[in-house]
């Protein structure tokens, strides 16, 4: 049964911010948008995701090429590198990881994250607009969540279990994202996502299929 709180608005983030930094990213991505802005910004993300194809195969190839790297590095770089290539960007995984650590409103920003944001905006064409925010936000959203999902899958793997079945089980039993935050009657409320790991309602993750394909491609290599 869906939790009606999942459809409530997210906690507000400051809107009057200087363009180009982490706070600007928060103020312009669908993830933290006000209801009146959310549908438009989510559509920008969907437009970037729609042309992507063969992500499982591409993640497989990149993971195979990186097989001698530490697993933790593979998990942190391959998802971002695959999606960045689909967006026509170079491997920006290092900068995305830096921004990801400061992305959520309850975390602190810092000079490293601000510098990374400037490089990412420049890599996206230099315009600090909603499309650029959508592209960077897409990669940030993929960074930690996909790494955690694949990491949990590697820990939980049972002999003979294939990537698809393993991921389905992990999402049921030990999802990487267990709670989200919503704004109810002027207060922040945590909403349980255990039974809906990709969210619910209008804020459901638009990249679920893409994340699963990338995760499967990585596991196809690492489980061998």
Identify the residue ranges that each predicted region occupies.
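Cytochrome P450 heme-binding Cys-pocket and its upstream "meander" loop
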Residues: 190-216
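A residue-level signal for conserved active-site and pocket-lining positions in enzyme catalytic cores
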Residues: 45, 79-80, 142, 170, ...
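Conserved cytochrome P450 K-helix E-x-x-R motif and the immediately C-terminal K′/meander segment
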Residues: 126, 160-192
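Conserved active-site beta-strand-loop modules that form the wall/rim of enzyme catalytic pockets
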Residues: 135-137, 142-153, 179-180, 185-196
């Amino acid at each position: 049964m869906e939790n009606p709180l999942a459809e409530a608005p997210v906690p507000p983030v400051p809107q009057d911010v200087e363009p180009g930094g982490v706070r600007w990213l928060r103020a312009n991505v669908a993830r933290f948008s006000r209801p009146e802005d959310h549908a438009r910004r989510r559509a920008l993300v969907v437009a970037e995701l729609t042309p992507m194809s063969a992500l499982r195969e591409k993640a497989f190839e990149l993971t195979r090429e990186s097989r001698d790297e530490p697993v933790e590095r593979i998990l942190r770089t391959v998802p971002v590198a695959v999606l960045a290539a689909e967006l026509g960007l170079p491997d920006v995984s290092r900068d995305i990881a830096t921004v990801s650590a400061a992305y959520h409103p309850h975390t602190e920003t810092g000079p490293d994250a601000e510098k990374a944001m400037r490089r990412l905006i420049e890599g996206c064409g230099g315009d600090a607009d909603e499309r650029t925010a959508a592209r960077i936000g897409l990669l940030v959203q993929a960074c930690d969540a996909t790494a955690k999902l694949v990491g949990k899958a590697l820990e939980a793997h049972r002999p003979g279990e294939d990537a698809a079945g393993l991921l389905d089980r992990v999402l049921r039993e030990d999802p990487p994202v267990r709670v989200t935050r919503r704004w109810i009657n002027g207060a922040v409320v945590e909403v349980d996502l255990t039974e809906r790991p990709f969210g619910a309602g209008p804020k459901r993750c638009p990249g679920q299929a893409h994340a699963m394909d990338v995760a499967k491609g990585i596991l196809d290599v690492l489980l061998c």
